[in-house]
């Protein structure tokens, strides 16, 4: 399977042909790294799916380029997990992407605690813009999205056209369930964020993440009390 598909050459027929030939998550990753080489990056949040994907990627590319959107607002447990991952997978090139504005500069320009009065702008400044800048030099990126995570993600494919960042988005875990993720973590004794043991299924910035009140909704604790359910990275 030698087909190469990019944002500029995308067509639905070719993407379907490629997807139909991909058997499972490892097959997806093998194809992705073979096809895009140094022009593909994994944007990892270091959540449960992230730990699975990191381990799978290590079987395909031990020197993979990994990025983390360091908003400066993450839980201490998240930063500690990243250090653990660096020790477990020393070949990975893990890059911390920081926003252009420090929290102090952001507060001066837009008002303090922006995440409270304008969470969309806060995500734009501290997540979307740094990622967009980094991805401008890439052809494809890998994401840990799963179809059963939320209604907004139920139609994702292995290979997707990303209109927001104008590249190809690869999602190897689309068919995995939450139970599948944790079965893999336990089977392979993978490290994970200890907040998961405190009813945090989805973990983002500390100010915008609470324990989930609904065990059937993994993202119920994100931006609790607001209509917002996504940071915007995966919305067109």
Curated annotation (Swiss-Prot):
HAMAP family: CysH
Alphabetized CDD domains for the sequence: PAPS_reductase
Disulphide bridges, residue numbers: none
NCBIfam families assigned: APS_reductase, cysH, PRK02090.1
Cofactor note: Binds 1 [4Fe-4S] cluster per subunit.
EC number per UniProt: 1.8.4.10
Function summary: Catalyzes the formation of sulfite from adenosine 5'-phosphosulfate (APS) using thioredoxin as an electron donor.
GO molecular function: 4 iron, 4 sulfur cluster binding; adenylyl-sulfate reductase (thioredoxin) activity; metal ion binding; phosphoadenylyl-sulfate reductase (thioredoxin) activity
Pfam families for this protein: PAPS_reduct
SUPFAM superfamilies to which the protein is assigned, alphabetical: Adenine nucleotide alpha hydrolases-like (SSF52402)
UniProt KW Metal-binding keyword: yes
Name of this protein: Adenosine 5'-phosphosulfate reductase 2
GO cellular component: cytoplasm
Subcellular location: Cytoplasm
Pathway: Sulfur metabolism; hydrogen sulfide biosynthesis; sulfite from sulfate
Enzyme class: oxidoreductase
Main localisation: cytoplasm
Family: Belongs to the PAPS reductase family. CysH subfamily.
Region Disordered, annotated ranges: 216-236
Keyword annotations of the record: Cytoplasm, Iron, Iron-sulfur, Metal-binding, Oxidoreductase
Binding site for [4Fe-4S] cluster: 122-123, 205, 208
Catalytic residue list: 231
Entry superkingdom: Bacteria
Any one GO BP annotation for this protein: sulfate assimilation, phosphoadenylyl sulfate reduction by phosphoadenylyl-sulfate reductase (thioredoxin)
Reaction catalyzed: [thioredoxin]-disulfide + sulfite + AMP + 2 H(+) = adenosine 5'-phosphosulfate + [thioredoxin]-dithiol
């Amino acid at each position: 399977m030698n087909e190469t598909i990019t944002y500029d050459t995308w067509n639905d027929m070719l993407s379907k042909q490629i997807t139909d030939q991909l058997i499972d998550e490892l097959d997806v990753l093998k194809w992705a790294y073979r096809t895009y080489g140094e022009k593909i990056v994994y944007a990892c949040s270091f959540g449960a799916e992230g730990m699975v994907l990191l381990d799978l990627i290590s079987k395909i590319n031990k020197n993979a380029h990994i990025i983390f959107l360091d908003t400066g607002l993450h839980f201490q447990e998240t930063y500690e997990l990243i250090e653990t991952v660096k020790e477990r997978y020393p070949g990975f090139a893990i890059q911390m992407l920081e926003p252009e504005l420090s929290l102090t500069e952001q507060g001066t320009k837009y008002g303090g605690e922006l995440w409270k009065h304008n969470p969309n702008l806060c995500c734009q400044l501290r997540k979307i813009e740094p990622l967009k800048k980094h991805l401008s030099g890439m052809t494809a990126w890998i994401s840990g999205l799963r179809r059963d995570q939320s209604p907004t993600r139920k139609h994702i494919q292995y290979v997707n056209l990303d209109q927001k960042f104008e590249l190809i988005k690869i999602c190897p875990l689309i068919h995995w369930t939450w139970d599948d993720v944790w079965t893999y973590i336990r089977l392979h004794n993978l490290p994970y964020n200890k907040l998961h043991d405190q009813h945090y299924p989805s973990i983002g910035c500390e100010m915008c993440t609470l324990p989930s009140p609904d065990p059937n909704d993994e993202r119920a604790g994100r931006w609790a009390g607001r209509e917002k359910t996504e940071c915007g990275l995966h919305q067109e």
